[in-house]
A protein has these predicted regions:
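Periplasmic alpha-helical coiled-coil/stalk elements that build and connect Gram-negative outer-membrane
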Residues: 3-115, 227, 231, 272-274
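Amphipathic alpha-helical coiled-coil segments
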Residues: 3-23, 34, 41, 77, ...
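Transmembrane beta-barrel architecture of outer-membrane proteins
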Residues: 10, 55, 147, 175-177, ...
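Metallo-beta-lactamase
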Residues: 70, 121, 283
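Structural signature of outer-membrane beta-barrel channels/translocons
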Residues: 73, 142-144, 183-187, 286
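Acidic, glycine-rich loop-and-beta core segments that form the ion-binding/anion-interacting portion
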Residues: 92, 100-103, 108-153, 157
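Small/polar, glycine/serine/threonine/aspartate-rich low-complexity segments that form flexible
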Residues: 95-109, 138, 151-188, 195, ...
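Acidic, low-complexity, intrinsically disordered peripheral segments
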Residues: 279-319
Length: 319
């Protein structure tokens, strides 16, 4: 169940990321198209060179290629989501704006590691396997030991025709017995010893499997925890970079209008802005998905965690 929740969430965010990429590429195409038209007008009136027009045309052609790739990627991601949820043409709801990303609570990696070592399904399964192996060893070792059986019986004998001493007299005899039997095992050709050795080997293997499971879970939990922390830092940095990129683009546009910047400066600033927007959107999805993966690694992922993610989505549009 936990694996299914993560896979569906992954496919859901993949579609949203692909939609964002297409949206940003189309917005960049519009901006480059306007810059291309401006470069052509300036060339016609003699205020710019043909190089400006050619640079803008080359950038426009590149964005067209990126748009085609983004459209195809979105189709592929939607097909993957449809196949996973069993719905044709599923329409994921985007994140609300602004996006209040959840914090890790508690923000202590040791807490999550200890929780994982105790509750992760793989660890619990390995612990149960070890308990079974120990019971099998104890069972095999009893082959060397004497056993005591409690025996009890009750017998009723009816004589409708009487007995030799009392012919013709109907009689019934009740006999009850109880006793204890002591069984001493004899030499059985090393069968018991071999069985004990086998169960001890299986017990040792089960102990090693449990320790391996605990180490793997601890490593996966730490990786997930630090991944979410790093992702949250990246989101903050990219939010600042987005604002800076927008300011840089505005400054380059103004500089181009007054003749202190050239066309390629504006085109590069546009590319930087929309690339930052794409990176920021992807980083947000990575944080949300990483939060689910952290809880999965700790063995605590449930529907309530998915519902908390759902609360961050924008209200669904009414038909």
């Amino acid at each position: 169940t936990q694996d299914l929740l993560v896979r569906v969430s992954q496919a859901y965010f993949d579609v949203l990321a692909a939609q964002d990429t297409l949206t940003f590429v189309q917005a960049q195409k519009t901006a480059v198209s306007e810059q291309l038209a401006s470069a052509k007008r300036n060339f016609e009136v003699g205020t710019s060179t043909v190089t400006d027009s050619r640079e803008a045309q080359a950038r426009y052609d590149l964005v067209i290629a990126q748009e085609i790739a983004a459209e195809n990627d979105l189709r592929v991601k939607k097909l993957a989501l449809d196949q996973l949820v069993g719905v044709t043409n599923a329409q994921p709801v985007p994140l609300a704006q602004p996006v209040p990303l959840p914090r890790i609570e508690p923000a202590n990696v040791d807490y999550w590691v200890e929780t994982a070592r105790a509750q992760q399904p793989g660890v619990r399964q390995a612990a149960i396997a070890l308990d079974i192996a120990r019971l099998e060893t104890q069972k095999a070792e009893t082959g060397h030991r004497p056993t005591v059986d409690l025996q009890a019986g009750y017998n009723i004998t009816r004589n409708p025709n009487g007995t030799l001493t009392a012919p013709g007299v109907n009689s019934r005899t009740n006999v009850a017995s109880i006793g204890v039997a002591l069984n001493l095992p004899l030499f059985a050709g090393f069968a018991v010893q071999n069985r004990v050795k086998e169960t001890l080997a299986l017990e040792t293997k089960a102990e090693a499997d449990l320790e391996t499971a605990r180490r793997n879970v601890a490593q996966a939990t730490r990786s997930a925890f630090f991944g979410v922390q790093s992702g949250q830092g990246q989101v903050q940095a990219l939010e600042a970079a987005e604002a800076s990129s927008q300011t840089a683009l505005d400054a380059n546009k103004l500089g181009y209008q007054v003749g202190v910047r050239i066309n390629i400066d504006v085109l590069n600033a546009q590319s930087q802005l929309y690339q930052t927007k794409r990176d920021l959107a992807q980083a947000r999805y990575n944080v949300l998905l990483g939060t689910l993966k952290l809880r999965q690694a700790a063995g605590t992922l449930g529907l309530e965690d998915v519902q908390r993610i759902n609360s961050l989505l924008a209200p669904a549009k009414q038909p």
